[in-house]
Swiss-Prot record:
It is a single-pass type I membrane protein. This is Transmembrane emp24 domain-containing protein 10. Keywords: Cytoplasmic vesicle, Endoplasmic reticulum, ER-Golgi transport, Glycoprotein, Golgi apparatus, Membrane, Protein transport, Signal, Transmembrane, Transmembrane helix, Transport. Residues 201-213 are cytoplasmic. Belongs to the EMP24/GP25L family. The keyword Transport applies. The keyword Ligase does not apply. Probably oligomerizes with other members of the EMP24/GP25L family. It holds the Pfam family EMP24_GP25L.
Amino acid sequence: MARLTALLFLPVLIESAFSISFFLPVNTRKCLREEIHKDVLVTGEYEISEQVVTVHTSSTVVGDGSIFKITDSSSHTLYSKEDATKGKFAFTTEDYDMFEVCFESKCTGRVPDQLVNLDMKHGVEAKNYEEIAKVEKLKPLEVELRRLEDLSESIVNDFAYMKKREEEMRDTNESTNTRVLYFSIFSMFCLIGLATWQVFYLRRFFKAKKLIE
């Protein structure tokens, strides 16, 4: 069976948590991609329904389980689990990057599709404020204020990043416009030079043919 690959692209949103369920056919790889900022805590849980593999004498059914892997744009592995069925993961991003979460079924044969459930959180949603409250002995109101403070900081960072991107794009546009202007001026001088050369060449040609004085 041919190997299939499906990519689901997730946009960058202020909301920092999502839950998704999908079916994973045999010998198939499905991935989700999401952009996440630098120094952001990412946590999640996953659960994959187990494949029941029955071996018959007249059929070939091979079951190697499923592989769960998280990588960045440089193909660095942040989390990997073979024969994955259920688990949790957590990591902190080092740079702003595109991260890819992949599930791959290595089983071949006539077996049911696996059901995959994924809950992923990052930023404010990934923090365990109940644990923070216990460690720092915070009151419920103080915990809520801490959460709102972290949320506000996250939103400010998002806007700061968007402003930075806008400035970078503006600088790129200005640089491109300058290059186009210089190229246009250069092209104009080339055309003027070519036209002048043609005039003198034709003048000499006509004089040589004694068509003009």
